[in-house]
């Protein structure tokens, strides 16, 4: 089982605040996510600028595409994104369109499982050639005190068994990682737990050490 990668979510409102994070921890993570908030605040230039600064890193545009899959994904890939996200409620043809464009750029598409989705949809994504999903505990669920539970673990295992590469996100803390031991997680996303730490560098390194211990 390969080691899960570590992704930092830049859910900043401005490039200046995003740079404050990347200057510290870009070399400690595998994937730099241009979060939805930053995509809206700064547009695709955020993707272009971060990829120019860190060409050796995977840069994800978390656009959460809901429609116009080909147009929006092309905008992201032409800005040199490696991956883009499509929201789970999007029509299957939106996901297919985004994937077609991704292939032109040797990129990839992730289905963001935020909100309601079904296992029937999941099978449609697999049948369409989608390989990646993001299992998401929403900000609102976190704020309501909803913790990771057995239902989450069961769903993640089932997605993995279907052949998906699963990314896990949603207020992920260091102490949550052992919950997922034994599951071939593709990526763990940490946002505030790294960005807002007293030492973001040490926080990122702690995540990497824990991942190596649990999956190594």
Swiss-Prot record:
UniProt cofactor(s): Mg(2+)
Listed CDD domains: KGPDC_HPS
Keyword terms: Carbohydrate metabolism, Decarboxylase, Lyase, Magnesium, Metal-binding
Cofactor binding: number and manner: Binds 1 Mg(2+) ion per subunit.
Catalytic activity: 3-dehydro-L-gulonate 6-phosphate + H(+) = L-xylulose 5-phosphate + CO2
One protein family per Pfam: OMPdecase
Annotated InterPro entries: 3-keto-L-gulonate6Pdecase_UlaD, Aldolase_TIM, HPS/KGPDC, OMPdeCOase_dom, RibuloseP-bd_barrel
SMART domains reported for this sequence: OMPdecase (SM00934)
Pathway: Cofactor degradation; L-ascorbate degradation; D-xylulose 5-phosphate from L-ascorbate: step 2/4
Residues bound to substrate: 11, 192
GO term, biological process aspect, one: 'de novo' pyrimidine nucleobase biosynthetic process
HAMAP family per UniProt: UlaD
Family note: Belongs to the HPS/KGPDC family. KGPDC subfamily.
Chain's role: Catalyzes the decarboxylation of 3-keto-L-gulonate-6-P into L-xylulose-5-P. Is involved in the anaerobic L-ascorbate utilization.
Protein name (Swiss-Prot/TrEMBL): 3-keto-L-gulonate-6-phosphate decarboxylase UlaD
Organism whose genome encodes this protein: Salmonella typhi
Origin organism lineage: Bacteria, Pseudomonadati, Pseudomonadota, Gammaproteobacteria, Enterobacterales
């Amino acid at each position: 089982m390969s080691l899960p990668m570590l992704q930092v979510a830049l859910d900043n409102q401005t490039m200046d605040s995003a740079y404050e994070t990347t200057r510290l921890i870009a070399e400690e993570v595998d994937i730099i996510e241009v979060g939805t908030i930053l995509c809206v605040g700064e547009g695709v230039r955020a993707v272009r600028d971060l990829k120019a600064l860190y060409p050796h890193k995977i840069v994800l545009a978390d656009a959460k595409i809901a429609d116009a899959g080909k147009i929006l994904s092309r905008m992201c890939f032409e800005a040199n994104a490696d991956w883009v996200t499509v929201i789970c409620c999007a029509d299957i043809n939106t996901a297919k369109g985004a994937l077609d464009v991704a292939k032109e750029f040797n990129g990839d598409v992730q289905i963001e499982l935020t909100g309601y989705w079904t296992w029937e949809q999941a099978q449609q994504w697999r049948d369409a050639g989608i390989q990646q999903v993001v299992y998401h505990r929403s900000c609102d669920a976190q704020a309501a005190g909803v913790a990771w539970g057995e239902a989450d673990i069961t769903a993640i295992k089932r997605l993995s068994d279907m052949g998906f590469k699963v990314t896990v996100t949603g207020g992920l803390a260091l102490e949550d990682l052992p919950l997922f031991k034994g599951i071939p997680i593709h990526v763990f996303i940490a946002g505030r737990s790294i960005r807002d730490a007293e030492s973001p560098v040490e926080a990122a390194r702690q995540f990497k050490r824990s991942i190596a211990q649990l999956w190594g």
